[in-house]
Amino acid sequence: MKRDKENQTLTRVEMEIMNRLWAKESNSASVRELLAEYPDPKPAYTTLGTYMKILTEKGFVKPEKREDDGKTFFFRPLITQNEYRKIVMKDVKNTLFGGSMRSLVNFFAKEEKIPDDEIQELLSLIKE
């Protein structure tokens, strides 16, 4: 059952998988192709396959078969990385900062020690 992505979050492992898919030039990959990118010790093929099933059920990826390889499923993201960032940041702003952009920015300004050049760049972006 596919659910609304705006109400879904990705686990750390799911996020790692999605980042690998988003980085693909072909915008899709099989479990075997994804597995080849992992450093040793690699997760089990079945473990990665289970995560792909979960991501499919959550509505983040779609399994497809290519014409040139009718046996293997290739998984294509159904949401862009930027779209997911927007969803997550909106949720963080609303749930942790009471919907206040000012509180969110204030938190990062105080906690992250933003370099002066980045502050100037941020101010320029705000003025646009």
How should each PLM-predicted stretch be described?
Residues Y84-E128:
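Amphipathic alpha-helical dimerization/coiled-coil segments
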Residues T56-R66:
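A short, conserved structural fragment
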Residues G49-K53:
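Short, hydrophobic-biased segments on the C-terminal half of alpha helices
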Residues L10-V13, R66-I87:
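Short, cationic-aromatic polyanion-contact patches
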Residues N27-E37:
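Short acidic, hydrophobic short linear motifs in intrinsically disordered regions
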Residues A36-Y45:
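Short helix-coil junctions and helix-kink-helix linkers
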Residues M1-R20, T80-E83, E128:
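Short alpha-helical segments that sit at the start of domains
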Residues W22-N27, P41:
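Short helix-capping/hinge SLiMs at alpha-helix to coil transitions
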